[in-house]
């Protein structure tokens, strides 16, 4: 299985980078992991709704160009479906059983995801109704994917 994480924005803090590196290393036993970092647009303070929408659309174009045609796309969105860790594991497992070999998770920038990206998504996943920094969300997502594989393999980790 190939797992791709498409993210808007770069990680600047060393502790986030270390966590991403650790979970990437752990996941290498279970899947081929690719992390695609896309540049984010500068968001002016007090930007109008129109400007914010333009920024989301520019970022959205970059996201869509990074998604392979055969990918099953899972967009992280507040309005998505919340799953527990076992349900996420079952979802990934079922996709593999059904013949999906490429899952792409998408993490948007500070303004969220463009409508075009949400339309391209095969599934919308929410981790919470709260908003998280995209750097932290990347770590949380990778940890949950790692946990999902451990659950699938009946290996100790998940409690």
From Swiss-Prot:
Homodimer. InterPro entries: Alpha/beta_knot_MTases (IPR029028), RlmH-like (IPR003742), tRNA_m1G_MTases_N (IPR029026). S-adenosyl-L-methionine binds at residues 76, 108, 127-132. It comes from Lachnospira eligens (strain ATCC 27750 / DSM 3376 / VPI C15-48 / C15-B4). It catalyses: pseudouridine(1915) in 23S rRNA + S-adenosyl-L-methionine = N(3)-methylpseudouridine(1915) in 23S rRNA + S-adenosyl-L-homocysteine + H(+). It is an enzyme of class 2 (transferase). One of its GO terms (cellular component) is cytoplasm. Pfam families: SPOUT_MTase (PF02590). NCBIfam families: PRK00103.1-3, tRNA_RlmH_YbeA. The lineage of its organism: Bacteria, Bacillati, Bacillota, Clostridia, Lachnospirales. Belongs to the RNA methyltransferase RlmH family. It is found in: Cytoplasm. Its EC number is 2.1.1.177. This is Ribosomal RNA large subunit methyltransferase H. The gene is rlmH. Keywords: Cytoplasm, Methyltransferase, rRNA processing, S-adenosyl-L-methionine, Transferase. GO terms for molecular function: rRNA (pseudouridine-N3-)-methyltransferase activity. Specifically methylates the pseudouridine at position 1915 (m3Psi1915) in 23S rRNA.
